[in-house]
């Protein structure tokens, strides 16, 4: 599987966890990294044809970004507006990304317990990420379970470095696609009638 990581940090060199993740991913086989801030420059202008060609040569697309104001930094939105165009990603003939996977790799400043009803952010991260999920669905992509590191505002260096292993494990999880996990569970139920009876 060919993986394309679109890094959308406004200043990757000054980043903490995103830079650590990029360093780890850069030494991983079959992974291509594109720094959108560097490519788009200060005007955030992209060569749509070149970016679309990069998407088409990969199977899994990863949006990597720090979670700012409950969304992504402006550079990713600019990239999406210019690259995921009518006739390419949606609309008549816009099925070029059909079957490809989209995964979000993000870090939040707030702790995990702040992202739920009753927490100070009120909603789960999954709820905040619905626009990205719908983007994937509109483009006929498979939206995979995101990897989220919470609590960057107070994270220690050792915690940041320790996040690399679970991050890489997440990206290589064969059951990231819920359809794959569901198929396995159904097969297990078919093979074990007693288990099927227990959950009915």
Annotate each predicted stretch with a short phrase.
Residues 1-37, 168:
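N-terminal beta1-alpha1 ligand-phosphate binding loop
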Residues 22, 26, 135-200:
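Glycine-rich phosphate/pyrophosphate-binding loop and the adjoining helix
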């Amino acid at each position: 599987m060919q993986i394309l990581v679109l890094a959308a940090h406004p200043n990757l060199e000054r980043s903490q966890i995103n830079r650590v993740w990029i360093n780890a991913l850069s030494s991983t086989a079959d992974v291509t990294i594109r720094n959108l801030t560097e490519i788009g420059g200060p005007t955030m202008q992209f060569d749509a044809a070149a970016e679309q060609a990069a998407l088409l040569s990969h199977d899994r697309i990863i949006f990597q970004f720090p979670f700012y104001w409950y969304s992504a930094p402006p550079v990713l939105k600019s990239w999406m507006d210019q690259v995921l165009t009518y006739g390419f990603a949606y609309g008549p003939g816009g099925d070029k990304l059909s079957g490809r996977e989209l995964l979000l790799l993000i870090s939040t400043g707030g702790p995990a317990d702040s992202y739920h009803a009753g927490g100070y952010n009120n909603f789960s991260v999954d709820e905040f990420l619905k626009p990205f999920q719908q983007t994937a669905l509109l483009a006929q992509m498979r939206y995979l379970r995101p990897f989220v590191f919470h609590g960057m505002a107070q994270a220690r260096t050792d915690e940041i470095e320790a996040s690399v292993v679970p991050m890489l494990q997440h990206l290589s999880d064969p059951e990231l696609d819920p359809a794959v996990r569901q198929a396995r569970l159904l097969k297990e139920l078919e093979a074990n009638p007693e288990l099927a009876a227990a959950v009915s």
